[in-house]
Amino acid sequence: MSVAIRPARTSDIKAIRTIIDTYSLQRRLLSKETVMLYESVQEFFVAEKDGAIIGCGALHVLWEDLGEVRTVAVNEEFRSQKIGHQILTAIIERAKSLGLKRLFCLTFETEFFGKHGFNERQGAPVEPDVYQQLLRSYDEGIAEFLDLESVKPNTLGNTRMLKIL
């Protein structure tokens, strides 16, 4: 049976949690509290095969024209089957439909994101007034995006990448 990419539901959170835990133990993804997953369920897409959730990814809107791709991961046994590409494509399409013009990610998978038009970037690509507004966020991902001292060295040592839509 084929893989379906769809918006996540609250009933998917336990499976998303399992996928995240696998990669966070390997220090390839940031761990997230379960409550944060429920709070952000509307940001997630999942890959479903035969009724099982085998992958996930999220789009987090940061600003009027800027979003972050978060938590793109596929169960190990289903890697190298283009499922991550399908998830990322759904995220990019959603970003465009929301009117976003730029997407960024923090990743070790630079080749994967590069195939989708993301390029390595140093520093935060926002104007000073937007930077000041983003400083008010308590979101750890935004702190890493802004390259704040409080999260240095970069929590995982990953690469900041940006895609212009």
PLM region spans:
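A conserved beta-strand-loop-helix scaffold within acyl/acetyltransferase catalytic domains
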Residues: S31-F44, K49, G55-L66, R70-A73
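C-terminal "cap" of GNAT-fold acetyltransferases
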Residues: V126-L165
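A short, internal acetyl-CoA/4′-phosphopantetheine-binding micro-motif in the GNAT/acyltransferase core
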Residues: V72-R79, F108
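Short amphipathic alpha-helix that is part of the acyltransferase structural core
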Residues: M1-S31, E48, G157-L165
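Conserved active-site alpha-helix within GNAT-family acetyltransferase domains
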Residues: S97, K101, T107-L134
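Conserved acetyl-CoA-binding loop-helix of GNAT-fold acetyltransferases
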Residues: S80-E93, C105
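A generic "binding-loop/recognition-motif" signal
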Residues: D12, D65, F108-E109
